[in-house]
A protein has these predicted regions:
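Bacterial Sec-dependent N-terminal signal peptides
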Residues: 1-26, 36, 438
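Bacterial Sec-pathway N-terminal export signals of envelope proteins
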Residues: 19-69, 181-183, 223-263, 317-318, ...
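Short flexible linkers and secondary-structure junctions
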Residues: 20-148, 280, 284, 325
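Acidic, low-complexity, intrinsically disordered peripheral segments
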Residues: 29, 411-438
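Sec/SRP-type N-terminal targeting helices
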Residues: 40-44, 57-58, 93, 107-135, ...
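Periplasmic alpha-helical coiled-coil/stalk elements that build and connect Gram-negative outer-membrane
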Residues: 51, 134-249, 359, 363, ...
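Small/polar, glycine/serine/threonine/aspartate-rich low-complexity segments that form flexible
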Residues: 67-105, 230-237, 270, 283-316, ...
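A short glycine-centered flexible hinge/capping loop motif at secondary-structure junctions
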Residues: 177-181, 388-392, 429
């Protein structure tokens, strides 16, 4: 690869990193909550569930219907009177008109309506918990990608520094060769190393672009690619394992949803039992009717009536073939199944919490060790670089120290963000991820 082309490519890339917008964690969360497609969807579901809890959807209000009708007929008829006289009515027209308003109201339905309405309220709470879980998952996904971008930014900077050192080494090797102080081999080795560093830098640059696009997707495509993320992180003070475990059993969103499902099923049992009781209804209506005809045989040419009517009705299914009994039994069995599911979930949740806690502690310790390893690698590189400049170390030893330092930096960066993501996974399990400052 032409060294001039490499330098131009790296320069252009470096210029692209200057003065870019900083996307802070708080801003990323704000953008995700406002624009993420999944969160928008669940917010709509919450609105629907809230609408379902309205008194208009409760069954407590009466129904009022209006009816109207009209008819027309034209007939030929013949009638014989008592005195033997016969009369005919040809083309006699009859018109009928009617209108009514009808009221129906259920006074008592065995309390089924009450328990159904309570179900709607609990289902609304369940939908809110489902929305919360979606938001928690989105926040975890957001920061998994966010910190991947941060890691790649730090990796790119580290590789850029390595490239700059290799560039300086190549310049030195070329000068030394020009003045007869070294062989052409040293210059060629330096050129090979700078080629490798440039390839690593371009790959890191491409990965960074890809992950920025992934991050932008989670944010609802609200940003362009010219942004940086905050690489300064702090870890939460998660010292008391038992206290956090208790919070997990109280606030884990999936466990809370199971509790709501159990509550809903208990209401279903009560609602199904309402089938054992009678239903009492109230009816009322106001009607108007008019009939007119021009038949000479008719005693009344026009008749109009209007008035109110009302009544009570009672229905009691003394035996419905056993369907109510079957539904009640099945609802009780479903309640047992849900409680078994909850017991299993709690055991699984405790296991997942312990795994997440140990994983977090392990990764946090690895990060701290890698921080110490950086100091050792940096010290080793500084010494080797000084010897190399004095001619007391060869290019192979210098390159190895350079690679060791770069690998230590890349490993430290990975350990740093792995520990942070592990912390967020632990907070997600415990139901605390929305209560911490990012």
């Amino acid at each position: 690869m032409n060294i001039r082309v490499i330098f131009i490519s790296i320069f252009l890339f470096s210029q692209g990193l200057i003065a870019q917008e900083l996307l802070t964690p708080d801003k990323a969360v704000s953008l995700a909550l406002e624009n993420n497609y999944g969160i928008k969807f669940v917010n709509t579901q919450v609105e629907i569930a809230n609408n379902n809890t309205s008194i208009l959807n409760s069954g407590y209000l009466p129904t009022l219907t209006g009816n109207a009708g009209a008819s027309f007929d034209k007939q030929d008829s013949e009638g014989k009177l008592a005195n033997g006289e016969t009369r005919e009515a040809n083309g006699a027209e009859t018109r009928r008109y009617n209108a009514s308003v009808n009221l129906n109201y259920t006074l008592f339905d065995g309390l089924g309506r009450m328990y159904d309405y309570k179900q709607l309220k609990v289902r609304s709470q369940l939908t809110e918990l489902q929305a919360r879980e979606t938001i928690e998952n989105t926040i975890l996904q957001l920061f998994t990608i966010y910190y991947s971008v941060a890691e790649l930014e730090e990796n790119t900077n580290a590789i850029s520094q390595t490239f700059a050192i290799s560039k300086d080494r190549l310049t030195r090797a070329q000068y030394q060769f020009d003045y007869g102080q070294s062989t052409k081999l040293a210059s060629l080795n330096a050129e090979v190393d700078i080629n490798n560093d440039s390839i690593a830098l371009m790959n890191s640059k491409q990965q960074l672009k890809n992950f920025k696009r992934d991050l932008n997707l989670v944010l609802g495509n609200t940003l362009n690619e010219d942004f940086d993320v905050d690489t300064q992180i702090s870890f939460s003070n998660l010292m008391n394992k038992d206290e956090l475990l208790q919070k997990t059993k109280l606030y884990n969103s999936a466990l809370q949803q199971l509790d709501k499902n159990i509550e809903i099923n208990n209401l279903i049992i009560k609602s199904e039992k309402s089938g054992y009781l009678p239903t009492v209804g109230l009816t009322g209506s106001y009607g108007w009717n008019e009939t007119s005809n021009n038949s000479p045989l008719a005693f009344v040419l026009q008749n109009t009536s209007s008035g109110f009517s009302g009544g009570l009705n009672l229905r009691w299914d003394l035996f419905d073939g056993g369907s109510t009994l079957t539904r009640v039994k099945n609802a009780k069995l479903n309640s047992e199944a849900l409680n078994i599911q909850k017991e299993e979930f709690i055991v699984t949740l405790e296991r997942d919490f312990n795994n997440a806690w140990d994983d977090y502690q392990n990764k946090l310790n690895i990060f701290r060790l890698q921080e110490e390893n950086i100091k050792t690698s940096q010290n080793n590189f500084d010494r080797t670089q000084e010897k190399f400049k004095l001619g007391q170390s060869n290019s192979i030893e210098f390159r190895q120290a350079q690679i060791n330092l770069l690998n230590a930096e890349l490993t430290r960066n990975q350990a740093k963000y792995d520990a942070k993501i592990s912390e967020l996974q632990l907070l997600k399990i415990s139901g605390e991820i929305l209560n911490v400052k990012f």
